Amino acid sequence: MTQLTVKALSEEIGTPVDRLIEQLADAGMKKAGSDQVTDSEKQTLLTHLKKEHGDTSGETEPTRLTLQRKTRSTLSVAAGGGKSKDVQVEVRKKRTYVKRSTIEDEAKREAEEVANREAEEKAQRDAEEQAKRDAAEKAQREAEAKVTREADAKREAEEKAQRAQAEKAKKDMNSKNADANAQAKKEADELKARQEQEATRKAEAEAAKLVEEARKLAEENQERWSEEEKKKKEQEKSADYHVTTSTYAREAEDAADKKDEKAPRRRKKKPAPATQPGNNRGGRNQRGRGGKGKLAKPTSMQQGFDKSATVAKSDVAIGETIVVSELASKMSVKATEVIKVMMKMGAMATINQVIDQETAQLVAEEMGHKVILRKENELEEAVLADRDSDAIAEGRAPVVTIMGHVDHGKTSTLDYIRKAHVASGEAGGITQHIGAYHVDTDNGMITFLDTPGHAAFTAMRARGAQATDIVVLVVAADDGVMPQTIEAIQHAKAAGVPLIVAVNKIDKEGANPDNVKNELAQYDVIPEEWGGENIFVHISAKQGTNIDGLLESILLQSEVLELTAVKEGMASGVVVESRLDKGRGPVATVLVQSGTLNKGDIVLCGQEYGRVRAMRDENGKDIETAGPSIPVEILGLSGVPASGDEATVVRDERKAREVANYRQGKFRDVKLARQQKAKLENMFANMTAGEVAELNVVLKADVQGSVEAIADSLLKLSTDEVKVNIVGSGVGGITETDATLAAASNAIILGFNVRADATARNTVQNENLDLRYYSIIYQLIDEVKQAMGGMLAPEFRQEIIGLAQVRDVFKSPKLGAIAGCIVTEGTIKRSNPIRVLRENVVIYEGELESLRRFKDDVQEVKNGYECGVGVKNYNDVRVGDQIEVFEIVEVKRTLD
């Protein structure tokens, strides 16, 4: 009879030991894990289990079922000699199925026990935390009461001491005033007398000093004049009267002069026939006095001109850049001469290379020409500088732009302000003709810009026209922060304009202004009551609630900014919008920023110009003049200017036309230059010397969590040399607003699990922006990190590749000292730089002139071989020296 222990039986049937012991106890048998179990006890346990599960049939059902399967197949395998053989393959599979009812019951019971324990522990923790909170609140209240009592007592003591001290000081002051007045009068009289004596003494000393200096100057001038006269006479005596610069011609001239001095003076004879005009042989047959057949020696080798020719010096006008060939043409010399001079000065250039103004100036002055420096925009600067500058700046009205999400009450706010504050008397109400208007309040005037969306605001900022002083952000109290609200915040921060938040619709059910504050705080818009810098005003545009408070907040912010402008003189401003009217031609809305714009003035607007033929205000009325912060509509320009262009009044219409034509010609160059911006591949070229490189990024993702994670990771990549600047971020697809913001900020666009719409793609293509899509955050971080690494300056490192020991020194007639060496480490290469070491001290650094092995020139010699080494421009090589060969390796820098 086979007997098993309880533990062995549990392992055989796949049931935990504790569970099996409980089942045996339920069947009436108390057993431990090491007790024996007989066959009869097994049968008793089986019968009990069947009754417990409702099975009284007595038949044994298996709890485990094992299936075995065999599969045979034939595999053809290549053998040697191009033949193949068949291999029998047998696959055996075995699978066991177990009944899970017992295990599931056990797991269910254990889960219930765990849940009960967790509930008890949670209740206990909650009770402990509540007790701690009650104790902390009680202690805090007691501490606050104690601090309040101490502060009151201290304040009362200080007030009492101050009153006593003030009474004492008043008594002392009354007694000292009389003595102080008499003493002060006496000291003033003494000081006045001393000052008069000191002034007299200084005047006498100054006069004596001037007389002495005049005497010394006269003596010095007399000595200098006598010395200059003496030097002049000596130079005339020793002057060299050669008429040529050639060495041989000078020697011949000196010999002829000596011969003429030795010859006796004779009567001048008739000139020889050879000098007559008809004799072309010029004295070839002229016989000398010495005898027949001898030619007469020439009296001198003097050339046929009396003085040397000099290059004509001229004035050379040089712009900001100039081509080498053009510079040579202006100096009337060959381009090769200019290149030679530049090579002597240490600058290599080609005939078609463009050089800067400073280099061209040095070259021209080196060649003896006078340089006139010119600027390309010299005419433009001269025209804009010819203005009235004597006027004094005065305070001006603020220019306000109202922005916000759609249906948040921006239009209603504007309408209510117009109805309440624009001067009455207009028949049929007020009609807005242009996109800007101004209102008069009790505390001052305010100018509003009605910009459709954020595109116009971004375009004006991209052209550098900061026309807006304050941005009012309208947020609905029931909707909260929306996508266009976030975009408005980003634009205001990028422009550096203060932000005033107008919380609208506070009279509506469900309005929650505190929720708006909490949402805006996530975008660094903090209310003043929370310690921030932004003013929050609760309004209702429909009921007109607190509109006056909004206007007062705007005027208060303008007083803090201290906005000033020149009211008199020639006007300047910015183009808010422009259009082409069918009956009136080009029409431009101009916001005057300084000066006074008059009807008939000549205006220069970007690439357009013209005389102001008519001016209208926002109500459509004709006006004659407009001061600062006043929007007007002008007619008479040559074309339609772009929004954001600067409008300036000039004196001369002809010069205005020239400047406009120059700007039109330069527009193409500017457009081509803009195509190279915001490229990850060209970021290193956009760096300027001595500045920190910035990588501007516009980030869009599918969820807010991804935006925060990616933005935090990108900002952590910033270093001292390269900085990541996130100019815009948000949730959702890439829109046209994002593309316009990237174009204005020179940024790249990164999309994480989002795509750009059709209008955004057109803007990206037209502006030639860099748009990239990602679905894995690590790929995005790695590519940005690689781009930032490419913006880092490279590092160079020296690596020693070989070392040779000098065994002997030989002399060569061509190369000088030749060192017989043996290579002890690495490899000696001919083209690499070397150092000569003596007792491990560097005594020379240069390059190899010769490397030979057995009289053959070689390129390299490896370790253990002998060779002959000739060091260029160095002959002091001694036995025992070491020749170290190294190479300069460029190390690519990374952000790691």
From Swiss-Prot:
Residues 284-295 have a biased composition (Basic residues). InterPro entries: DNA-bd_dom_put_sf (IPR009061), EF-G-like_DII (IPR053905), EFTu-like_2 (IPR004161), IF2_assoc_dom_bac (IPR013575), IF2_II (IPR044145), IF2_N (IPR006847), P-loop_NTPase (IPR027417), Small_GTP-bd (IPR005225). It holds the Pfam family IF-2. GO terms for cellular component: cytosol. GTP binds at residues 404-411, 450-454, 504-507. PANTHER family: TR-TYPE G DOMAIN-CONTAINING PROTEIN, TRANSLATION INITIATION FACTOR IF-2-RELATED. This is Translation initiation factor IF-2. Residues 57-66 have a biased composition (Polar residues). CDD domains: IF2_eIF5B, IF2_mtIF2_II, mtIF2_IVc. Residues 404-411 are annotated as: G1. Residues 101-174, 184-240, 250-263 have a biased composition (Basic and acidic residues). Residues 450-453 are annotated as: G3. It comes from the Bacteria. One of the essential components for the initiation of protein synthesis. Protects formylmethionyl-tRNA from spontaneous hydrolysis and promotes its binding to the 30S ribosomal subunits. Also involved in the hydrolysis of GTP during the formation of the 70S ribosomal complex. Residues 540-542 are annotated as: G5. The gene is infB. Residues 395-564 form the tr-type G domain. It is found in: Cytoplasm. HAMAP family: IF_2_B. Keywords: Cytoplasm, GTP-binding, Initiation factor, Nucleotide-binding, Protein biosynthesis.
